[in-house]
Amino acid sequence: MKLTLKVSGKFFDEENSENLSLLRDVIIDLVNNGHRVAVVTGGGGTARRYISMGRKLNLNESHLDILGILVSRLNAQLLLFSLDNIAYPKVPESIEDFNERWASGKVVITGGFQPGQSTAGVAALVSEIINADYLVLATNVNGVYTKDPQKFVDAKLLPKLTVSELKTILEGSQSVNAGKYELLDPLAIKIVERSKIKVLVINFKDLNKLPNILKGNEILGSVVVPE
């Protein structure tokens, strides 16, 4: 299979840093089992701190986005170093860069590309260009819920849903401000929709179960299916 793994920037926050070795080991396991893997890293708390400081300096949204992009690329570089020779040795800075490096046959790890675009949008673009079998979103919730599970105790996990159903759930919760992107931003959803990309949403703490999920040996998270 060809997989795009979108890793929440929270994975790289200090309190979750012990999970980085898990992430590295899962990627190695996937490669050893014959999968081709692209990874997109978010910026996490470090990006939000820089964006917050930038706002206090009255920076515009494009400049704030660039700060977030630079942090996401630093996270990508950290993961890249940990994978040694199975990963392409440089972090791409555009979709064209990514495409050239994907041709190497190695794992390619990237952060953000340009202002106004979330790393979820980057992950959707990457999935489209490699014709991924799955876009895997490793985030801080257990899947897609009927509403925000961190705010509503009666939120219900949806094991399977369509892109249209996902759009309805996310409608009204999207923000285009730097550092405020939701699970999938509008651009990411459009790309997923037009290219009929299958999306798997799981908690990043369950990432070690991904190989079994892909084999059909375990059911976890939410699958967003094309229409």
Swiss-Prot record:
Protein name: Uridylate kinase
Gene transcribed to yield this protein: pyrH
Pfam assignment, any one: AA_kinase
Catalysis performed (reactions): UMP + ATP = UDP + ADP
SUPFAM superfamilies: Carbamate kinase-like
Subunit structure: Homohexamer.
EC number of this enzyme: 2.7.4.22
UniProtKB keywords: ATP-binding, Cytoplasm, Kinase, Nucleotide-binding, Pyrimidine biosynthesis, Transferase
Source organism superkingdom: Archaea
GO CC, alphabetical: cytoplasm
InterPro entries: AceGlu_kinase-like_sf, Asp/Glu/Uridylate_kinase, Uridylate_kinase, Uridylate_kinase_arch/spir
One annotated GO molecular function: ATP binding
Binding positions for ATP per the UniProt entry: K6, V7, S8, G9, K10, G44, R48, T139, N140, Y145, D148
Record entry for activity regulation: Inhibited by UTP.
Provenance organism: Sulfolobus acidocaldarius (strain ATCC 33909 / DSM 639 / JCM 8929 / NBRC 15157 / NCIMB 11770)
Compartment(s) of residence: Cytoplasm
UniProt keyword Nucleotide-binding, yes or no: yes
